[in-house]
From Swiss-Prot:
Changing K112A: Loss of catalytic activity due to disruption of binding to the substrate 3'-phosphoadenylyl sulfate. Changing R167A: Some loss of catalytic activity. Widely expressed. Signal peptide: none annotated. Changing R203A: Complete loss of catalytic activity but only moderate reduction of 3'-phosphoadenylyl sulfate substrate binding; probably disrupts binding to the polysaccharide substrate. Pfam families: Sulfotransfer_2. Residues 387-406 are annotated as: Disordered. The chain crosses the membrane at residues 50-70. It comes from Homo sapiens (Human). This is Uronyl 2-sulfotransferase.
Length: 406
């Protein structure tokens, strides 16, 4: 005689093959008996609602991230190639074996950070490689109204591709106005060195003006032109104080009013934009390595740039932009500048560290030399750039056009 099949709870199974029990309505008995067998399926309407709400928040967050200027696809692919992608980057579609080079590049050049040299190189390269170099007739307006942002983004976005747009302008969020976010590049330098170069350039110009007996700012009063740099700093003149000293960070923070206020908010936002929207931010003190990396990242724009840069004729032209009549501030004045520019230095050192990490990934060594007797920001940099001056309109591209026509 066969034993009855025992129920896991100890009793005999009163129904074969899961048939309903007794007179219970069809399906009800089955439901009551099966739920204990599958405890992991138990959930309440509250649990269900919680899960759906969580999913909705995640989807909305993802959408807002993309609409607020998430990284361009090219930068995400590049992160994966370099081995420094984030969790979210890695869970997208894998990059192709050959990276599609971007056809929209913006160089929102920081004043007095080598941009004259780079623009001269770009003019030569655009003829050589056939890309569209887009410049602007406005050289002294970095902060834009909302309407001005929309108009500029529209003009840039409708340019013939591949294009490289260059202008002294604070970071623009194309995605905010419905445009495709381009890839950004830029170069910065030691903040005190940049400030000193600008201070004396506004007053005395460079070697081009010196040779042609040109006065850089004819409307400047003589007492202002010959104002001692130490007096300007120690007596807290506006030109040597904040917010005027808070100069580099806004180029990366953006157009928000708080980006012009020295503080942690602008600093952190600038770092975030560097990570998400800039293909490369180099430092002027290592310009050759900057050009080498640009040639590797953007060969259809920068192929052969290092050879052109090292050409004696080009270097001769570039050296004409060196600022003249620089003097060295006192150690006391320098320490005050350091204190006033602490956010600028925190950003500079962050960018420098990221740049060196990138160099190591490409097998480039960062040569650390012994510290000079004087601080390094007093050592003249061979190639300077022109600064957009707020109080005087100018055409800082004309000299490039004249040189290029020779």
């Amino acid at each position: 005689m066969k034993k009855k099949q025992q129920h896991p709870g100890g009793g005999a199974d009163p129904w074969p093959h899961g048939a309903p029990m007794g007179g219970a309505p069809p399906g009800l008995g089955s439901w009551k008996r099966r739920v204990p067998l599958l405890p992991f399926l138990r959930f309440s309407l509250r649990d269900y609602g919680f899960c759906m709400a969580t999913l909705l928040v995640f989807c909305l967050g993802s959408l807002l991230y993309q609409l607020s200027g998430g990284p361009p696809r090219f930068l995400l692919d590049l992160r994966q190639y370099l081995g420094n992608s984030t969790y979210l980057d890695d869970h997208g579609p894998p990059p192709s074996k050959v990276l599609p080079f971007p056809s929209q590049v913006v160089y929102n050049r920081v004043g007095k950070c080598g941009s004259r040299t780079v623009v001269l190189l770009l003019r030569i390269l655009s003829e050589k490689h056939g890309f569209n170099l887009v410049t602007s007739d406005i050289h002294n307006k970095t902060r834009l109204t909302k309407n001005e942002q929309m108009e500029l983004i529209k003009n840039i976005s409708t340019a013939e591709q591949p294009y490289l747009f260059t202008r002294h302008v604070h970071f623009l969020n194309f995605s905010r106005f419905g445009g495709d976010q381009p890839v950004y590049i830029n170069i910065i330098r030691d903040p005190v060195n940049r400030f000193l170069s600008n201070y004396f350039f506004r007053r005395f110009g460079d070697w081009r003006g010196e040779q042609n007996h040109m006065i850089r700012t004819p409307s400047m009063r003589q007492e202002e032109r010959y104002l001692d740099i130490n007096e300007c700093i120690l007596e807290n003149y506006p030109e040597c104080s904040n917010p005027r000293l808070f100069y580099i960070i806004p180029y990366f923070c953006g157009q928000h009013p708080r980006c012009r206020e020295p503080g942690e908010w602008a600093l952190e936002r600038a770092k975030l934009n560097v990570n998400e929207n800039f293909l490369l931010v180099g430092i002027l003190e290592e310009l050759e390595d900057v050009l080498l990396l640009l040639e590797r990242f953007l060969p259809h724009y920068f192929k052969g740039v290092l050879s052109i840069y090292k050409d004696p004729e080009h270097r001769k032209l570039g050296n004409m932009t060196v600022t003249v009549k620089k003097t060295v501030p006192s150690p006391e004045a320098v320490q005050i500048l350091y204190q006033r520019m602490r956010y600028e230095y925190e950003f500079y050192h962050y960018v420098k560290e990221q740049f060196h990490l990138l160099k190591r990934k490409f097998g480039l060594k960062s040569h650390v030399s012994k510290p000079p007797l004087r601080p390094h920001f007093f050592i003249p940099t061979p190639l300077e750039t022109e600064e957009p001056i707020d109080d005087e309109e100018q055409d800082d591209e004309k000299w490039l056009e004249d040189i290029y026509k020779r």
